[in-house]
């Protein structure tokens, strides 16, 4: 089995092949995201702690977190699921994935070093690969350089040198995201003002509608009362005429 080991602190990654079954036994029956001591791999790994981050079986199917089995299953996957990238909007597909429990049928196991041991591993912990790009978000730049809210973040942007033959050397900087500028604050104030105007307008319209509704209801009530009074007058008139006719007979 091959072990793909990465060390985030230095940015290095190394693929080693282990043939001894006894060394690999410590990773069997362990689920993804489990932290395991790497001491059985050899004396140079003494004190190291690694986390199982994934792997592939001998047919190339990836391990999927949450699938509690050794074998393969076919799952209906959509956007946002691991082990699947949709080609069209809303597309879903049934894909074969391997369970998250490790065993001898894996061809590659991915490990992440979470605790460094006593000795350095050549090509993994003894060298550092610099990051190509710096942070882009304003809060992350502040965190990197330990800046206060009052400090100007734009002066601390990590610039990337661009060199071309026969041209002046120049640098390129990312556009800072979530940067609080006077323009942003002005837009925020405008949004709040527009929201207040909308609420005020809605209140006024609601009060006008309530007044109009009350007026219409009052008019309807008066009309209904007039109709009732008219009916009563007519009924009393009929009653009086019928009495006079009966008395004449």
Curated annotation (Swiss-Prot):
Residues 236-249 have a biased composition (Low complexity). The modification Phosphoserine is found at residues 235-236, 240, 244, 247. Residues 216-229 have a biased composition (Basic and acidic residues). The keyword Phosphoprotein applies. Keywords: Cytoplasm, Phosphoprotein, Ribonucleoprotein, Ribosomal protein. GO terms for biological process: cytoplasmic translation; glucose homeostasis. Ribosomal protein S6 is the major substrate of protein kinases in eukaryote ribosomes. The phosphorylation is stimulated by growth factors, tumor promoting agents, and mitogens. It is dephosphorylated at growth arrest. Pfam families: Ribosomal_S6e. It comes from the Eukaryota. GO terms for cellular component: cytosolic small ribosomal subunit; nucleus. It is found in: Cytoplasm. GO terms for molecular function: structural constituent of ribosome. Component of the small ribosomal subunit. Component of the 40S small ribosomal subunit. Plays an important role in controlling cell growth and proliferation through the selective translation of particular classes of mRNA. This is Small ribosomal subunit protein eS6. The gene is rps6.
